[in-house]
Regions:
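Short, acidic Ser/Thr/Gly-rich low-complexity loop/linker segments typical of extracellular
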Residues: 156-158, 166-187
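Beta-strand-rich domain onsets/edges
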Residues: 36-155, 167-168, 226-234
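A short, solvent-exposed loop/turn motif at the edges and junctions
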Residues: 2-12, 191-214
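Divalent cation-coordinating acidic motifs and surrounding scaffolds
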Residues: 160, 170-178, 199-465
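Short loop/turn and low-complexity linker motifs enriched in small/turn-promoting residues
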Residues: 1-37
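Exposed aromatic-hydrophobic patches
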Residues: 23-25, 181-191, 224-227
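Short flexible loop/turn segments that cap and initiate beta-strands
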Residues: 152-164, 196-197
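Extracellular Ig-like/FN3 beta-sandwich strand-entry sites
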Residues: 19, 141, 194-198
Length: 465
C-alpha cells in the first residue's frame, strides 16, 4: 500500500526487485552523486526526417536542411533497469520482433536548453533552421531579461512582468521563475518589426506595481531590480502532462505512461514542503472518425487520480502527420485550473508531430505561447520517434517563448522507431524519468528565507549563463 499524508491511499499488489525498493522511499538516495560516462562513451548519430519534410513543405519554396550532427554522451554507466510490467512487442525492420517491458527507467532522452546555448541558437535559427521561421510564422526575437530579488539577495518568484512600449502598448508579459528571472520578447512573429524606441517594464508583486525605465535587450545587459519585500515563496507546484495519443505514438506510449506515473510519485521526494498538483490532457486530431479531440483531467493533489487517468489512455486515430496540438495547448493553458499563485507551473508536451499549418493555427500558436508566458506556465516539449526538423524548431520556439527547455527521446533505449538528432553541438543521454525529475527540481528549488544564495555550481537549467 502506498500512502502519503493527505492523499488517497491505494492498495496494489506489485512485484518489486531489490534494486527498485528505493522507488517507494520518500527520501533521496544516500548516494546523491551523478554518474558520469566512462571515457570514450561519446557517440554520434544522425537521422533524416523526409516524411515530415514532405508533409510540412511550403508550396512556394522547397525547404532544405543542412545536416548538423550532434554528439551525445551517455550519462548513466549502467543500462536502465525497468520495473516489472506488461511487455510490449516492438517490430523490427527485418520482420522480427523484440519484447521490452513497459516499465519506468526504460526510455532515454536528452535536453537542449537554448537559453544556455543562446549564441548557438541564434546561429542555428538564422541559418540551418531559418526556413522554418516562415513555415510556422514563429520566431521569438528581441529578448529582454529581468532579474528580480529582494534586499536579502533572494530571488522573487511569480512576479508578473510586462514589457511595454513608451505609449503603454504591451508587447509581452511573463512571470519570474524560481531564480527570480523573467524572459520576455519584443516579438514572436518573424514578420513583425522590432521596436526601435526605448521600452520599459512594469513589475506587479503582492499588490504593488513598480516601473523599470529604459530597459536593455539581453545582448546589452540583464535588467536587475531589487524590491523591499519579505521572503515567502509559494509552496504550490502545478504540473500538466499534455500527450499526443494518436496511433503513431503507440510504439512508445506504454513506456511513456510508466515514466509519467513514476515521475508523479517521485515528485514527493523532491521537497516534502512542496505541494504538487498534477493534471493531464490527452489529444488526437480533428475529424469525424476520431473518438475525441482532447480528453482532460483537471489538477488534483491526489497522485493516484492522475496515475489512474494516465494508465487508462490508449493511442489510436490520427492518420496524417499534423495533429490537434493547438487544441490541446488551448485546453491545458486556458481550461485547466492553474494556481493563481505558485512557485512553478510546468507543462510537459509529449508529441511526435506538430499542428496543422494554416494562418489561423499559426496565429493561435503565437497567442497560446504569450498566454502561457503571461500565466507563468513553462512549456517543456518532449519529442518522440518520428519527429522531424519542422516540429523540433517549433518546440524549441515554444520553450523559448515560455522560459522552458527542449527535451527529446533518443535511440539509446531501443524503444520505438528512429529518433531525430537535434540540431546542436552536444547533449547528455539520461533516462527520461531522471531527466524530467531533474527539470522539476531545477524549476522548484529556492533557497530558504534564512539563508543567502549558495555560491555553488548547481545542476540547474537556469535561463542565463
Amino acid at each position: 500500500m502506498v500512502h502519503y499524508d493527505g492523499y488517497e491511499s491505494e492498495t496494489r499488489m506489485v512485484r518489486v526487485k531489490a534494486d527498485e525498493k528505493v522507488d517507494f522511499a520518500v527520501i533521496e538516495a544516500k548516494d546523491g552523486s551523478k554518474r558520469r560516462p566512462a571515457s570514450g562513451s561519446a557517440v554520434t548519430r544522425s537521422s533524416s526526417d523526409a516524411s515530415e519534410r514532405a508533409t510540412y513543405a511550403s508550396p512556394r519554396r522547397e525547404l532544405k536542411y543542412v545536416s548538423t550532427t550532434a554528439a551525445s554522451t551517455v550519462v548513466s554507466a549502467d543500462a536502465p533497469s525497468p520495473s516489472d510490467g506488461e511487455s510490449t512487442r516492438i517490430p523490427l525492420a527485418d520482420g522480427g520482433v523484440i519484447e521490452k517491458k513497459a516499465g519506468h527507467g526504460v526510455l532515454t532522452a536528452g535536453e537542449v536548453n537554448d537559453f544556455a546555448k543562446w549564441t548557438q541558437w541564434q546561429d542555428i535559427a538564422g541559418n540551418t533552421l531559418s526556413a522554418l521561421k516562415d513555415l510556422w510564422a514563429m520566431a521569438p526575437s528581441g529578448r529582454y531579461t529581468l532579474d528580480l530579488q529582494n534586499k536579502s539577495g533572494l530571488p522573487i518568484a511569480d512576479a508578473v512582468v510586462h514589457l511595454k512600449k513608451k505609449d503603454g502598448t504591451e508587447l509581452y508579459s511573463a512571470r519570474t521563475d524560481n531564480t527570480g528571472k523573467a524572459e520576455l520578447w519584443a516579438a514572436l512573429d518573424p514578420m513583425a518589426p522590432l521596436p526601435k524606441e526605448r521600452l520599459f517594464m512594469e513589475v506587479e508583486y503582492r499588490g504593488r506595481t513598480t516601473r523599470v525605465d529604459n530597459v536593455k535587450p539581453f545582448e546589452r545587459a540583464v535588467n536587475r531590480m531589487v524590491l523591499d519585500v519579505p521572503c515567502g515563496p509559494s509552496d504550490l507546484v502545478d504540473v500538466a502532462f499534455v500527450v499526443d495519443a494518436t496511433g503513431s505514438m503507440q510504439d512508445e506510449l506504454d513506456f511513456l505512461t510508466a515514466e509519467m506515473n513514476d515521475i508523479i510519485f517521485r515528485s514527493k521526494r523532491i521537497n516534502d514542503k512542496l505541494n504538487f498538483r498534477f493534471a493531464n490532457v490527452f489529444y488526437r486530431d480533428i475529424g469525424s472518425s476520431e473518438e475525441y479531440a482532447t480528453r482532460s483531467m483537471d489538477f488534483s493533489r491526489v497522485l493516484s487520480a492522475s496515475v489512474n487517468f494516465i494508465s487508462d489512455q490508449r493511442a489510436d486515430g490520427g492518420g496524417d502527420v499534423p495533429e490537434a496540438v493547438d487544441l490541446a495547448l488551448d485546453s491545458a493553458i486556458n481550461h485547466l485550473s492553474w494556481s493563481a499563485e505558485a512557485r512553478a507551473r510546468i507543462l510537459f508536451l509529449i508529441l511526435d508531430a506538430g499542428p496543422h499549418i494554416t494562418p489561423d493555427v499559426q496565429a493561435k500558436i503565437r497567442t497560446l505561447t504569450k498566454q502561457a508566458a503571461g500565466k507563468g506556465i513553462r512549456i517543456v516539449p518532449i519529442t518522440a520517434s518520428g519527429t522531424g526538423k519542422a516540429t523540433e524548431y517549433l518546440m524549441r520556439s515554444l520553450a523559448l517563448g515560455t522560459n522552458g527547455t527542449y527535451t527529446f527521446l533518443t535511440n539509446h533505449s531501443g524503444v520505438g522507431n528512429s529518433h531525430l538528432e537535434p540540431t546542436t553541438d552536444h547533449y547528455d543521454v539520461e533516462s527520461l524519468n531522471d531527466l524530467l525529475v531533474r527539470v522539476l527540481k531545477s524549476y522548484t528549488y529556492m533557497p530558504g528565507c534564512d539563508q543567502q544564495i549558495p555560491e555553488l555550481e548547481l545542476d540547474y537549467a537556469d535561463s542565463l549563463v
